[in-house]
Amino acid sequence: MKLLAMAVLLLTICSLEGALVRRQAEELSLQRLVSQYFQTVTDYGKDLVEKAKGPELQAQAKAYFEKTQEQLTPLVKKAGTDLINFLNNFMDLKTQPATQ
């Protein structure tokens, strides 16, 4: 009976040790994966900064903003004019009943 209890105890301890070793191995692989992920993100960020420093990208951005401004300026002016006309019509409607 004691021999059976010792065998069960030994098997339990060995299986727990094995699980602990596997868990530690999984943690190491997870740490390695996270480390590789951060390294990749860092490398990508450095490449992006180097590309952004180039005059080509800055020229493209400047051209994009100028084109956008050229297209939006007339729309904004028209919207402002329409808003003023709408408010004037609204004010005229309010003043007409008072004069009658």
Curated annotation (Swiss-Prot):
Show the GO MF annotations: cholesterol transfer activity; high-density lipoprotein particle binding; lipid binding
**Superkingdom of this protein's organism:** Eukaryota
Locations listed in the record: Secreted
User: What's a BP term from Gene Ontology annotated to this protein?
Assistant: cholesterol homeostasis
SUPFAM superfamilies assigned: Apolipoprotein A-II
> For this UniProt entry, what's an example GO CC term?
spherical high-density lipoprotein particle
Q: Which UniProt keywords apply?
A: Cleavage on pair of basic residues, HDL, Lipid transport, Secreted, Signal, Transport
Q: Where is the signal peptide?
A: 1-18
Q: Which InterPro entries match?
A: ApoA-II, ApoA-II_sf
Question: What is the purpose of this protein?
Answer: May stabilize HDL (high density lipoprotein) structure by its association with lipids, and affect the HDL metabolism.
Query: How does it associate, per the subunit comment?
Result: Monomer. Interacts with NAXE and NDRG1.
What family does the database annotate?
Belongs to the apolipoprotein A2 family.
Identification of the protein by name: Apolipoprotein A-II
Q: Which organism is it from?
A: Acinonyx jubatus
